[in-house]
Amino acid sequence: MYKRQLVRKANTTDNRILSLIEYNNEDVKQENSNKNPAVNSVQRDYMAGEVSRDLTTRMLLPHDIVEADREGIIHFHDSDYYAQHMHNCDLVNLEDMLQNGTVISGTMIEKPHSFSTACNIATQIIAQVASNQYGGQSISLTHLAPFVDVSREKIRKEVISEQELVGMEYPEDVLNEIVERRLKKEITKGVQTIEYQVITLMTTNGQAPFLTVFMYLNEAKNEREKKDLAMIIEETLRQRYQGVKNEAGVWVTPAFPKLIYVLEEDNIEEGSEYYYLTEPVSYTHLRAH
């Protein structure tokens, strides 16, 4: 008698939620290769998704749409997020947030004073965006390029200060070479921050951010910025070609971020100024596939 009462009280989502908690829901196991249904955060996302799906089919959608979906005439996407006022994808305006500051979790984030810090802030923005939507997002490396020169000037001041400390002065060409070498190390560090943060961050929906990185030289506002952007792109391609080590210590190509590289007159033809960037793009693409 008591069991019969429980059955009558059972919610329409009970069986599916219990099956995913016990890890015996085959639909969930096959649903999304980017989510591991054995992980607690993923299970919580799926539990919320079942509630949303139930509300969507019982209360929010017209009956004919629900029936057409069940019969396979159409497919209604993302019913597991439909109940919330949540959007899908974003083109992230990194430029505005980096240049003018932003707020993350109630904390004021001011304009960064180095390229590596700008990259770190960018990954925090990416994580926040990914945790408050259910689709992908895109950023442009052009928005990070101005901070290369910020770091250049900062490094120059540091080198000059070191000269004064030891009582010597480098010739201008030597000074410039030291600055550029240190700058390249900073660019490597910043790009690596984005690469590793993106693939290791776990957002509130239990997965790494679906990030696309846009690489377009002619978005740069001037020639100095364009050359700095080229350095960022070159390092991004180098690290993507190298890959990351998996749990077995084997180098693999990460699924994210996706890279989009734009071809124009100054990089498409052999012998053009930035063709040296275009060649490794093809190698990176072949290795990824």
Model-derived segments and spans:
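Extended, regular secondary-structure scaffolds
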Residues: 218-287
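Structured alpha-helical segments in the cores of large, soluble enzyme domains
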Residues: 164, 186-207, 229-249
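Conserved small/polar residues in nucleotide/adenosyl-binding loops
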Residues: 1-5, 284-289
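Hydrophobic alpha-helical scaffolding
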Residues: 177-184, 188, 222, 226
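Short, Φ-rich (hydrophobic/aromatic) sequence segments
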Residues: 123-126, 194, 277-282
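Often metal-dependent polyanion-binding catalytic scaffolds in large enzymes
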Residues: 3-183, 199-203, 209-215
